[in-house]
Regions:
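Extracellular disulfide-rich cysteine clusters
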Residues: 1-94
Length: 94
C-alpha cells in the first residue's frame, strides 16, 4: 500500500537509487527485516529515485510518520502477495 506524500522517519537498513518505485519494493522483499520503505516522490537530476528500506512500519512508529513533499511511504498491508498486487495496480493507474 502507499501513503502518498508521507515519510516514516526512522533509521533505514538500506538506501539505493532506483529507476522505478517498484524496484524499491523488490529490494524490500529480498530482506527479511524490511517491513516498509520510503521512495522519493520525484527523480533527481539523473532521473533516479531515492529508496530507503525500513526495519519497521508506520503502525509501530506512528510518532515518526509525517507528511512530506518529497517522499511516498509504502508498507505491507496484509501479505506480500496482496502487497505486490496493490503495488502493480497503483503503478498501472498512475
Amino acid at each position: 500500500m502507499i501513503s502518498e506524500f508521507s515519510y516514516l522517519n526512522i533509521t533505514s537498513i538500506g538506501r539505493n537509487l532506483i529507476q522505478e518505485e517498484n524496484d524499491c519494493g523488490y529490494a524490500c522483499l529480498e530482506i527479511p527485516s524490511c517491513f516498509s520503505y520510503n521512495v522519493a516522490a520525484f527523480p533527481d537530476v539523473n532521473g533516479k529515485l531515492l529508496c530507503e528500506l525500513l526495519p519497521s512500519d508506520k503502525y509501530n512508529n506512528s510518532d515518526t510518520f509525517n507528511a512530506s513533499q518529497e517522499f511516498h511511504h509504502f508498507y505491507i498491508p496484509v501479505s506480500q502477495t496482496t502487497y505486490l498486487s496493490q503495488l502493480f495496480h497503483w503503478k498501472d493507474n498512475k
